[in-house]
Amino acid sequence: MLRMNPGLGSSISVHPSELSISLFEILQGKYSYVRGQTLHCSLRNPGVFFRQLFIHLYKNALANCSYDHVLSDWRTYESSAKTRWPEKEAQWGSYRRSTFDSWAQTMRMTLDHLLLNAINRVLYAKTQLSYERYVDWVVTVGMVPVVKHTPDHKLVNSIQEQLMKDCQRLASGEKTIGRILTSVTQEISNLVSSLSALYIPGYSEVSIDYDCVKNTFVGLYKQKRVHVEVITMPAILAGRVIFDSPIQRMYTSIMSCHRTAEHAKLCQLLNTAPTKALVGSACNNVYKDIMTHLEQASQRTDPKRELLNLLMKLAENKTVSGVTDVVEDFVTDVSQNIVDKNKLFGTGQETTTQGLRRQVSNSVFKCLTNQINEQFDTITQLEKERELCMKRLKCIETQLSHQQPGDAKGPGSVNLLTANTFQSLGRLQDPSLQLTSSHIPSGSAVLNSFFSSYIPPVRESMKDLTNLWESEMFQTYKLAPVVDNQGQRLSVTYSQDTISILLGPFTYVIADLLQMELISHSFVSSSLQDIAAYLYQTSRLFVYITDVGQKYCLVTPPFENVPGKGPGETDWSANEYSCPEDSRVRRGLSRIPPPCGAPPCPGSA
């Protein structure tokens, strides 16, 4: 494990952190839940562990029997049958075969009923050890906190009492069944005691720290230190923890897909708005508004109105010729209301109209020059004040952004993906989503206004993320796909490598069930009845029952001298024998080879 050399006695917080909490939230579907993530549901299915417990208990139960008990139970049953069928003694071969078959099959049915009921109590008991939480911890942070406490004696005693009642009720006179139930009751009690003494807490119940001095991970659960089992060692570099887990490796891609989905939702909300308009500065319309107001509220002969009207028209013209035309129109209009001195006092060097035009032109240009200079000074001062205000506003927004996450009374963040569409449209004026205008400097032009209905390719991102989930889960845990005839995947199951990678550490490291064997991959999807049928065919009890049947169901009585044969010999060439036929034997699940040189048993292939 990579790590720096921190100070003496220091520790690094591993969980909870922003990263570790996000990894668990990904499993809960908070960020970009895609179809490929359903593989995790198959991975955390506890059915494989339940089948492993069933195989362990059923196999050990059938192994706890003795040949003497089996033979004693058979002889008791045979004696009881003879008292009920005394006239069948003449048909010696078929009678014995039928009697033994009925005893063997009823023995099997009774054991199946008792053992299945007994083991189901363990499989569905409310033990605190959770295989699902174990898998969640492994695929996120690669380590599992384990809390040890006293066993649940109430649960153990309840199961034990119920099993003893079943044993007394159904197997009071059977030595073999009684011994099997006694052994399985003891094994179940020990197993429930072990499982109920362990607890895997949820990610919100425990904290994990890394002790840099001892190079160990320590958990804290309800103010008590608990053991943390490391399945895959994380990397710790400069106080930063990088987990060695599938979710850690996919974290960047998952969050990128989630942000793309948020972006697409935001674009959808903006494009859903009924109206959109480009709003410009209103200063260009001020002069026209003033003129309209003056025309409506003032008389036409008002000198102030005429002068102000002149100034407004001059401000709208940006060329010298335009200004000249405005001045000439003004002089022509005003000169009609002034008395011509030439008609009263004679002709001079300059007419009244020419003099008035010259005076007005000089006054107007002087006024415009002063006004323009004042406007430039005002604009420069306002730009400086605006820059100062923008800096203060950005500083305040930065302070608010740092204070809002820690403010418990503040409003929660807007989740655009799950919030109501119309409510989200109303929140577009919120500070987090507000569309602000920008100042376009003089001489610049807007090249792209981004007022297009663009929506990010969220479907492609989710499809890529689905493929990434499938590839990561299949390659990391070696899952086996179940496909149909067309090659379409129907489901996934545990392979033998998956059992070794996940179920092995849970069985031997977490649960400490050292006496239990790992399940074979051929049983991971089989029903309990099919597993029980196979285990019975390969059990010690089946071997003992088969041996008793082969010795009892001979047509020629044992140790009887037949001409041409020694004591106890049977004429195998005449097919004068029979063997027990179990229901599974008839279906071809088991084949018991006859003695060397003998023909096969009836009903076998």
Curated annotation (Swiss-Prot):
Chain intervals with Pro residues compositional bias: 592-605
Protein's UniProt keywords contain Endoplasmic reticulum: no
HAMAP family (UniProt xref): HSV_PORTL (MF_04012)
Claim: Coiled coil is one of the keywords in the record: yes
Subcellular location: Virion; Host nucleus
Physiological role: Forms a portal in the viral capsid through which viral DNA is translocated during DNA packaging. Assembles as a dodecamer at a single fivefold axe of the T=16 icosahedric capsid. Binds to the molecular motor that translocates the viral DNA, termed terminase.
Cross-referenced InterPro entries: Herpes_Portal
GO cellular component, as recorded: host cell nucleus; virion component
UniProt-listed Pfam families: Herpes_UL6
Keywords of the record: Coiled coil, Host nucleus, Viral genome packaging, Viral release from host cell, Virion
Coiled-coil intervals: none
Region annotation (Disordered) ranges: 583-605
Family: Belongs to the herpesviridae portal protein family.
Subunit structure as annotated in this protein's UniProt entry: Homododecamerizes. Interacts with terminase subunits TRM1 and TRM3.
Name the UniProt record assigns to this protein: Portal protein
Domain of life of the organism encoding this protein: Viruses
Primary localisation category: virion
Organism whose genome encodes this protein: Human herpesvirus 8 type P (isolate GK18) (HHV-8)
GO biological process: chromosome organization
